[in-house]
Amino acid sequence: SVPEYRNEPEYRMFDRIIRGCMEKEKEARYQSADELQETLQELQNQLKEQAAESRIVVFAGAAAGIGTTHAALGMSHFLTRNGCPALYQEAYDTSAVRTLAKNMGIKTDRTGVYRIGCGSIRPYYGEAVKLPYLYFPVIIKDVGVIRPEEKLPEADFYVLVCGGKWWEIDRTVNAAKILKSRGNVILLFNHMEKKARLKLPKVLSDIHYFFLPFFSNPFREDKAANTCYRDLWNDGTGETRWKRKKLSQRLRRSDAE
């Protein structure tokens, strides 16, 4: 049988380079050392990207209908618009993204990703599906409603989308405890205004939290939401100041579409 690694893009590219050097016909070989060097440099850049680790941020919901997917999509688009390409990834068995794409008349590209505006969205495929490697500086994993019996992916930090009203606090506390046992967790209160009075129990007193203002479309820029996402990102990564990176023309054009 053919070794699995031979199906990887970098192996196929290396194989083409070798065959291009050994072709019997002169016209089929590389025409100059510069052409060969350029192709080898492209392969080297691809391998460097794969060696770089993506920063993983997991979004989880304390309850159904709290807005986890909306919040996660908003975060991925905020980062991408500001020069840090982020992949939104459905990390639990759901058809939400496919339903959204169907309603918008959008199909996946060859890597299994939907492109909406400047954003990249990968639906849930399950562990059995082998997809092409994609490098993104940040991957936003949406795990849906958090459940004690389910295994959570590793992450640089976790974001718990939750409610702070009196009937929601118990679920928020229980979900926060689960995430706190896994690593750094931040509470993101949805459907609540900043001025709302919030009294957290002592068990959550050391956990940082933010309020996500209402915004109807996660694919559109919203100034108030941007401020929340910026502060959330800085807190989760330990950065003290957000620096907006220069966007490429490609991203600018995509966001305008």
Spell out what each predicted region is:
Residues 15-16, 73, 173:
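Residue-level marker for well-ordered alpha-helical positions
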Residues 49-52, 220-257:
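NTP-binding/hydrolysis catalytic cores, primarily Walker-type P-loop NTPases
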Residues 50-82:
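Walker A (P-loop) phosphate-binding motif
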Residues 55-65, 85-154, 209-210, 216-223:
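P-loop/Walker-type NTP enzyme "switch/lid" segment
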Residues 134-225:
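Conserved catalytic-core segment of NTP-binding enzymes
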